[in-house]
Amino acid sequence: KLFGYPTGVGCLLARKTALSVLHRPWFAGGTVWGISVQGDGYIPLSGGEGFEDGTPNYLSLPAVTTGLNHLQTIGMDTIHERVRCLTGWLLDSLLALHHRDGTPLVEVYGPRSTRGRGGTIALNFFAPDGSLIDERVVDRRASASGLSLRTGCFCNPGAGEAAFHLSKEVLRKIFREEAKELLPGLFTGDGEVSWDQFLADLGMRSGGAVRVSLGLATNFADVYRFVQFAQTFLDTFPTERELPPRPHC
């Protein structure tokens, strides 16, 4: 999260007293002191070893040291201020974009200033008539322009539900009634499960949003280029057809 590499490496800091009261309902390789098939039992390792499944990604660990040293050389305060300034400029520039009739081009989810936010901006694009532009259209055009964006639904379902004003009653109805029909086909392969239909039943006009992430390596040319890309949607209606189906969230 701090410098983007390596992936698949992380750590959890926990007190020994806290670990001692945790009991895992399963186990995997490298987490047991002993195990028996005929005895139908196992004895877990104590401490952190009992929670480290498999072989640690030791080949990538030196990169963590190098990355942290690099951050220390630059200074976290400097990095924070730089990303804050880039994020603020990008937010102001995007929110200033309007179609010829005054309709806003984008809707930003979350704070519209740098107060209380990080360097990630989630947004959606809208056509001049106020209709939401499919995030798959944005993704396709961005890829053709050499821009790397994350589109669709993200890791925080609660924030997504709040952004799209989905009520608890609607969500409970969908998951209690429709999921009973969808899930068996998903797990058995007896029938196709349409995520697009699921979204339609929720009343959602989109599969999620467009996410722009700024960080250590981001420079002004990057955010300026994205604003130029966003401007290509002004006063236009997307004509893309045959968008790929959404297989899942």
Residue ranges and their predicted role:
Residues 1-249:
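Pyridoxal 5′-phosphate
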